[in-house]
Amino acid sequence: MAPKSKKAPSKKKMTKAERLRLMQEEEERRLKEEEEARLKFEKEEQERLEIQRIEREKWNLLEKKDLERRSQELEELALLEGCFPEAEKQKREIRALAQWKHYTECDGSPDPWVAQEMNTFISLWEEEKNQAFEQVMEKSKLVLSLIEKVKLILLETPTYELDHRTVLQHQGSILRLQELLSLKINVATELLLRQASNLADLDTGNMEKIIKDENVTLYVWANLKKNPRHRSVRFSETQIGFEIPRILATSNVALRLLHTRYDHITPLFPIAVTEQNQNPVGAEQVNVEESTEKAMTEEKLFTEEKAANEDEQPKAEQERELNLVQEENKYEAIENTVLQRTSDSEGEDSQTTQLELEMKLLSEAVLAAQLCLVENVVELPEASQAYKVDLCHFSTLGGVYHLDVLELPPQCKPVKGWVLVEILQEGLQRFIYPPDTTEEPDPDVTFPPIEVTLEIHKSVIFFERPRVVRWDNEGKFWRSDGISSVYYNREDRLLTFSMDTLGPVTLIQDAHVNMPYQSWEMSPCGMNKVLLIVKTVFMELQIYIKENLCMLASVKLRGKGLEFHLKGKWMAPIPFILALKEAGLNIFPAVYSHFYVVINNKVPQVELKAYRQMALLSSAFSFGWSKWNMVCNSTRVVIRVREQLSEETEHHTWSLLMFSGDRAQMLKMQEENDKFSEALREGTEFHSTLYHMMKDFASPVAMERVRHSNCQFIDSVCYMLLSIRVLSYS
């Protein structure tokens, strides 16, 4: 029999008093914890407020210190920024020297500055008749050079030195040269086509000719046999040509493809001229000279009057007081010497004042011109038609392809040792295709489009598939309709498309395809030389800036280096920018670019001050892109900065610098931080300029290099920064 299980001991029941005691202990513990938490919070809050008070006092002290020395720092900055008007003065001298050099060379070419010489050159060329195509191409080198020189005059000469009449004269010279060159090419084409029968190919019986130089390439084909089966026209050793319909294959026509590397069709953009600021320096100079001459004239009259009064003294008195007269003569000589010295001193002071006034006015004019480079227009011009190409959004590249179906002129005929030719008074005529007719169209007769194959020149880079547009001669604009079946062979750079009616065509690309930039960096490469690197979605550009010249050092497309014709060529900033734009490497925003690009907009005055002061420091300090520049508002910029004396020297660590135009400060945070903070870096202060901010921790060698930088170099660096606008378009 199994033993009985023992009963579990019964749990002792808690009394009411014990329950009350436990509840009381729990309440006391809760109150104690709450009190401890309250005391801890109050202590932490007091500590936080104390830290804030100390920081605020420190901040106020730094602000007070900054305000006390602001006037002194701005005066020092003004002395350093005197390099900008000095650089402009040197550029004036360079322009004057270039004119003098042209005058002394006597090479027969006109001076582009002198409208009369340009008019004479144009008139003489108009009188030259029946020039062969090779002669026209040779002459075109000089003509294109003159056009580029006149364009550079309009672009490089400050607007305050250009009056409206001069601008119109130069623009008129450009248009007349462009029109005359086009006319000469047409006449030369007509002369060539008159000899088509003599130049016919033995195999096909048709004439084919290719003439090319560095500016122009002519492809011309004359349909002499009128073979209806010969509808594919391909120029020898190329894939360039036409696919023509039967009606053209049986007509007395010629096909011309004239590729000009230049664009003389797109209208010139107007040059802004400020009438009220025309030559302010010269006007002030005249006023100063007039006042100086007036003062010197009054002094001269006073001296002459005094001398006349002395001559009228009675001789008797002079005889009686001979000794006194001798003493007076002695004192008079001393007085004249003092007057002469005073006059010389006043003349020197007047010249000094005049020079200071001239430089001050020039400095203000330069500052205003620089500010225009970073200002944006408020409204965008409205497009009148949907098919009209917006030249604010797109840019033409690769020149112009003039596609023409021409009526074959009467051929030369040899008769008894003579060459007879019928010369048409109307000259070279275009064959109308499709024909204009007022009658009802015949449904059995069709006019299919003409297929064209072009080769894109290697001097142009397209980051997207190029778009083909045609010229509207009546409306004077590029239009995108009337072109179909576009195919682009990227490897062979061949573009095939069809057109209803042949005419001038060009290729366009989004002008802002490389904006905004992904990053940028500017580093010194020794004295008066920097390397500016700009990275975009498609490419990386490396640009050297040395004194008053720029050079394309490297082009990388999707990480791969590219051999390019512009590499290694030193050019002045404006021609350099134009060359990059014409090559498709556009990193230069226009005043309307902000309508097409999402930008990090900055106040123009802040942006301008930053670029000017970065240029002043560029010989000894590197500057770079910071992601925090997007975080701060439009009144401040954030950049990375470090001292760097050359490419070989050991690099310092990057620091973050914030600048508002009136105050510069080093930030405590680093580029890698997750949150933006305006806290000051330990041991740093506020300053009114970037120069004085960097001076606090820079080496003496670096600051010495900054103070002795070349003014042309500083001006060129500033101009490139203003043109690329790395702070707003990155």
Swiss-Prot record:
GO terms for biological process: microtubule sliding. Changing residue 60 to S: In strain: C57BL/6J; could be associated with tumor susceptibility; does not affect binding with tubulin; more unstable. Disulfide bonds: none annotated. Signal peptide: none annotated. Its main location: other. Keywords: Cell projection, Cytoplasm, Ubl conjugation. Ubiquitinated. Ubiquitination leads to its degradation through the 26S proteasome. Ubiquitin-proteasome-mediated DNAI7 degradation occurs in mitosis. GO terms for molecular function: alpha-tubulin binding; beta-tubulin binding; microtubule binding. Part of the multisubunit axonemal dynein complex formed at least of two heavy chains and a number of intermediate and light chains. Interacts with tubulin. Associates with microtubule. Via its association with the multisubunit axonemal dynein complex, is potentially involved in the regulation of cilia function. May also act as a cell cycle regulator. Belongs to the DNAI7 family. This is Dynein axonemal intermediate chain 7. It comes from Mus musculus.
